[in-house]
Design a protein with these regions (language model features):
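Acidic/His- and Gly-rich active-site-bordering loop/insert found
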Residues: 54, 59-108
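Short polybasic amphipathic segments
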Residues: 140-147
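N-terminal capping segment at the start of a domain
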Residues: 2-36
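A gly/proline- and charged-residue-enriched helix-loop-helix capping module
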Residues: 119-137
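A generic local secondary-structure boundary/capping motif
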Residues: 70-72, 86, 130-135, 145, ...
Length: 161
């Protein structure tokens, strides 16, 4: 029986360091991005570091996009599209790479608090592959926004518990 090649043993020290750097970046992303809004904020920060500019700002400044320009458009702080302007006219088509944000979490329902058998419970939806029993052994944090309806503002808030 033929053994499959184990490429792990063939990595150079430089490749192992690069792999370690990428995994640390990924872990940092998972730690920073507990909600869609946090993930979009993180993505915008990284996009700016890579030379992307906000499309709204480009338009408001009356600038023209040129070949190679990088721009992003954010919608309601919950989704983002990033573009790199190509050489050919848009009428020739475009390449699209798409992804979605999936934040494993518990969403607390409206009026979530109830009592049964002398214990207080929170009624919640769970998303992103969580199992009902997984989260009880993990340190929890409340992440989200507070919507202030009379001012049309949303205020990000994080409360670690």
């Amino acid at each position: 029986m033929d053994m499959k090649k184990n490429l792990w043993n063939k990595y150079t020290d430089e490749q192992l360091k690069e792999l370690s750097d990428v995994t640390e970046q990924y872990k940092n992303c998972l730690n920073e991005c507990k909600t869609e809004r946090e993930a979009i904020e993180f993505t915008i920060e990284k996009a700016k570091e890579a030379g992307f500019k906000d499309l709204k700002e480009v338009i408001s400044e009356g600038k023209k996009l040129n070949t190679g320009d990088r721009v992003y458009a954010c919608c309601m702080n919950k989704s983002i599209a990033l573009f790199q302007i190509g050489k050919e006219p848009i009428s020739y088509g475009m390449n699209i790479l798409a992804a979605h944000v999936d934040s494993p979490r518990l969403d607390i329902k409206r009026n979530p608090l109830y009592e049964t058998d002398g214990l207080a419970y929170l009624d919640a939806h769970y998303y992103g592959g969580l199992k009902k029993y997984q989260w009880v052994a993990e340190p929890l944090a409340l992440h989200g926004v507070i919507a202030v309806s009379y001012t049309h503002l949303t205020l990000p808030t994080i409360l670690r518990v």
